[in-house]
Amino acid sequence: MSKDIKLTSLTKNSGCAAKIGPGVLHSVLSSLPKFEDENLIVGFDTSDDACVYKINDDTVVIKTVDFFPPMVDDPYTFGQVAAANALSDVYAMGGNPSIAMNLICFPSCLDISIMREILAGGYDKVKEAGAVIAGGHTIADPTPKYGLCVSGFARPEEILSNSNAKTGDVIILTKPLGIGIMNTAAKAELIDENKIKEVTSIMSTLNKYAKECTLGLEIHSCTDVTGFGLIGHSYEMASGSKKTIEIFSESIPIIDGALDYAKMGIIPEGMYNNLDYLKDKFAVGANISQELQDVLIDPQTSGGLLLSLPEKQAKEFLSRIENFTPYARIIGQVLDKGDKPIVIK
């Protein structure tokens, strides 16, 4: 057993870039029967971030599960990022996480202390979220993987969906894009330690703070931007809402260096899976470069919240969230349904 093996050397795809592509996933899930239960408010038949089940007239439980291979070599940081990513689904649905269970796959070639560090990173993020870890499950596996099964609670009227955007709303993104590209560059040892720290800081930041900034505001629709990229998750929102979302390319926050690496072809495999599914679902202006398109489809790991809300409410949200992040901004608007669900200008 070794402490010197790089975690990312044991993976082909890392973070949310390891997700099965949206096209394949949709074809599988659409063929499965749907469960009928009057208390199941949100199930897998929609593209929402978690399921929602009614406990009583005052309480719903939000359930989600998320795990993936490492995108960084430091085990503690990997644990933090994986936990932040799993917790995010509850925030995106308007709830607060309460209890979590560890899911860990661990290879015999690694020293057991590395597992302990991964779990410690997850524990600290769950504690920051105000939730508890109550157990978990382990599997021996040549490829390390970690994540959480999370349960959260909310009042029925607090639940947010990704399918209720209104014409005239503006779209806000709370974290910068380019995470998948930068992780791919890091695996190829093309970026320095300071840039790695910047990217991991973005990934490990809880969406708890963005969610808290929505309290009392009229949020029409919400999701988080993860493995299907900005265009993929915007498409889910536009399609579910029966609207078109126009994205302002010049307003999108992008990690410094991501466009350069995309131009060099340093992009994760998951981007091609996303493009294969999304290629006929968006239109781009003549001024949109190929590398920018790549960034917009880049699989994000523990990305930001994507919010649809009235412009006046958006200004209040941005004034609140500037205390937590410099990245949040208006990146688009919701239009009546047009020829394409997504338009990039």
From Swiss-Prot:
Enzyme Commission number(s) of this protein: 2.7.9.3
InterPro entries per UniProt: PurM-like_C_dom, PurM-like_C_sf, PurM-like_N, PurM-like_N_sf, SelD_I, SPS/SelD
Catalytic activity line of the entry: hydrogenselenide + ATP + H2O = selenophosphate + AMP + phosphate + 2 H(+)
Alphabetized Pfam families for the sequence: AIRS (PF00586), AIRS_C (PF02769)
GO CC annotation terms, alphabetical: cytoplasm
Active site: residue positions: C16
Cofactor: how and how many bound: Binds 1 Mg(2+) ion per monomer.
Annotated positions binding Mg(2+): D49, D89, D224
MF terms (GO), sorted A to Z: ATP binding; magnesium ion binding; selenide, water dikinase activity
Enzyme kind, highest EC tier: transferase
Annotated ATP binding sites: K19, T46, S47, D48, D66, D89, G136, H137, T138
Protein name as it appears in the record: Selenide, water dikinase
Provenance organism: Clostridium botulinum (strain Eklund 17B / Type B)
